[in-house]
Amino acid sequence: MKLLLTSSMILCFSVFANAQNIKKQEAEKIIKTYFSGYLQKDWNMTASQLADGFTFSSPAGDDHIPIAVYKERCFPNSKFFGTIDFPEIMVDGNKALVIYEITTTNSKVIRNVEYWTFSDGKVKSIECFFGGTGVGYPANAQNK
């Protein structure tokens, strides 16, 4: 009986632990679909990747803002997105570190790093990091 109970507990814990992890291919697909919404100026495509309770943070005063505020503050920048490249996407467990380069519609380059967390196949949070001069914003991007 003890063996059965112990085995059941181990199985439950391992299933729960594995449910928290995301495969690299799945994370990359979510990330690229999220950014495709920006490239296509399609909020619904981007929003479809976000979990309930999603938050966004950045050095621009965005401290764990909710989806509605994120849409209002950040998504309008999609009008500046020309192309995007991903030099690196690193996934570990339910987290990813994403390095990306956006070339704006006026040929300026933005390079950001973001720390993503996932929950049930959706993006739970994004923490964006860029230089203190606000280079992460398209209006402040540097010439190519």
Report residues per predicted region.
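Short, low-complexity N-terminal intrinsically disordered segments enriched in polar/charged residues
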Residues: 4-6, 14-44, 48, 139-144
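Short beta-strand segments enriched in hydrophobic/aromatic residues
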Residues: 50, 100-104, 130
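A short gly/proline-enriched turn/hairpin at secondary-structure junctions
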Residues: 53-65, 77-80
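Short hydrophobic/aromatic-rich beta-strand segments that constitute the beta-sheet cores
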Residues: 56-57, 98-99, 125-126
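Surface-exposed, charged secondary-structure patches
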Residues: 71-108, 113
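Short, solvent-exposed coil/turn segments at beta-strand boundaries
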Residues: 92-95, 116-124
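Low-complexity, intrinsically disordered terminal/linker segments enriched in charged
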Residues: 127-144
